[in-house]
A protein has these predicted regions:
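Acidic donor-binding loop of glycosyltransferase active sites
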Residues: 98, 217-223, 232-249, 263
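Carbohydrate-associated surface elements
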Residues: 106, 128, 189
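A short helix/loop element that forms part of the nucleotide-sugar donor recognition site in Leloir-type
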Residues: 134-146, 151, 347
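Nucleotide-activated donor-binding/catalytic signature segment of Leloir-type glycosyltransferases, i.e.
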Residues: 196-224, 228
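Short hydrophobic beta-strand element within catalytic cores of glycosyltransferases
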Residues: 259-260, 264-267
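Conserved donor-binding/catalytic core segment of Leloir-type glycosyltransferases
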Residues: 146-162, 168-171, 184-186
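A short, well-ordered alpha-helix in the C-terminal region of glycosyltransferases
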Residues: 292, 299, 306-320, 332
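Conserved acidic donor-binding segment of nucleotide-sugar-dependent glycosyltransferases
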Residues: 279, 283-290, 299-305
Length: 356
């Protein structure tokens, strides 16, 4: 089943059997009834703000209430200060589902504390990551046409609010200490941003690099990359950075992937990063501070042993985040809600404590 936003082209691949037009409420009811009739075992719903139609995505409630099949909802975002409408949608969705999955202990705690959700309704399952080998970055760089110059990497859909400017502003100080260091910004511009203002934001970053005299040390890879190539870029990175200014961010797929690749990570202390990078698994720096970022980068780029120590800790921690482990946990939850096994009385820390 796919949610179809307005103005998006088709068609979908063969595995998509049903399509819901995002802003057409009758589609939600029709597809729910179709799933009831075709004997679907379990319906797995991914909830993210902005995906579902209606006010704050409340059409998803009509969909879930029409379902007569066991339902598991995965919550990708839990807002620390929701509006009354956003809170109503999320709490109602959790109450309507047979099980709800969050990807961090911080998210589970927030739902319990601020939303009044019964913790027994929540399962904590890590954000999944590919099972990448732990390799030397310099052994991988030639596959991307790179020299062995040190690489600081960010990836994801490009858009404001991710702190890329702060990293670029840190680069003059970094290059003074490590002249051959390079910052790579990997990823296409977010399609919604592209639709509304084109490449204005990307150009502003490029202009910032030029103004600071580091244009030759900042590389923009302006395209979407598939999973295999993304894995290669992660393996090639010496340092990974998530400089996000929003300290309430409850999950980050990019940070999860960097953990899975065993990277030395520098990050602002948003909720998810604080959880994953605790106990010496990374470096946390204050948000919006080019100087703090530069200091962390220089330390790591000057000391291979420190990089490898941080990366090794991140890699070990991420082993329960790899997709086979995450898939096994979801199968357990699906079986439980389908009535095939009894609900567990206790869940092991390894499988329920978030690592991604």
């Amino acid at each position: 089943m796919a949610l179809h936003p307005p103005d998006e082209p088709g068609p979908y691949p063969a595995e998509v059997r049903h399509r819901i037009r995002r802003d057409m409420l009758p589609d939600y009811v029709f597809v729910a009834r179709a799933l009831n009739q075709c004997g679907t075992g379990v319906v797995s719903i991914q909830h993210e703000y902005g995906i579902w139609g209606g006010r704050d995505g409340d059409y998803v409630l009509d969909f879930v209430r029409e379902l007569r099949r066991p339902t598991v909802v995965t919550l990708h975002t839990v807002l620390r200060t929701p509006t009354p409408s956003q809170r109503h949608v999320l709490v109602s969705l959790i109450e309507a589902a047979d099980a709800s999955v969050v990807m961090s202990r911080a998210a589970a705690s927030l739902l319990t504390r601020a939303y009044g959700v019964d913790p027994r309704r929540l399962d904590v399952v890590p954000h999944g990551v590919p099972d990448l080998p732990l390799v030397s970055p310099d052994s991988v760089k030639p596959r991307l046409g790179l020299s062995t110059d040190p690489v600081i990497l960010s990836f994801g859909l490009l858009g404001p609010g991710k702190g890329y400017e702060t990293v670029i502003e840190a680069m003059p100080q970094v290059v003074e200490a490590v002249p051959n260091a390079r910052y790579v910004v990997l990823g296409a511009t977010h399609p919604e941003l592209l639709r509304h203002e084109g490449e204005k934001y990307r150009r502003s970053l490029e202009e910032c690099a030029v103004a600071l005299g580091v244009a030759d040390r900042v590389l923009f890879v302006d395209r979407f990359v598939g999973r295999r190539e993304l894995g290669t870029w992660l393996e090639a990175a010496d340092v990974f950075v998530t400089p996000y200014p929003n300290l309430d961010q409850i999950v980050s797929g990019t940070l999860s992937y960097a953990m899975g690749a065993g990277k030395a990570i520098v990050s602002t202390p948003y909720a998810y990063a604080s959880e994953l990078l605790a106990d010496g698994r990374g470096r946390l720096v204050e948000p919006g501070s080019p100087s703090a970022l530069a200091t962390a980068f220089i330390e790591l780029l000057h000391d291979r042993n420190v990089r490898e120590t941080l990366g090794g800790r991140a890699y070990e921690y991420s082993r329960s985040m790899i997709w086979p482990q995450v898939g096994a946990r979801y199968r357990q939850i699906f079986a439980r809600v389908a009535g095939q096994v009894a609900a567990p009385t206790a869940l092991s820390r390894r499988l329920t404590s978030v690592h991604g």
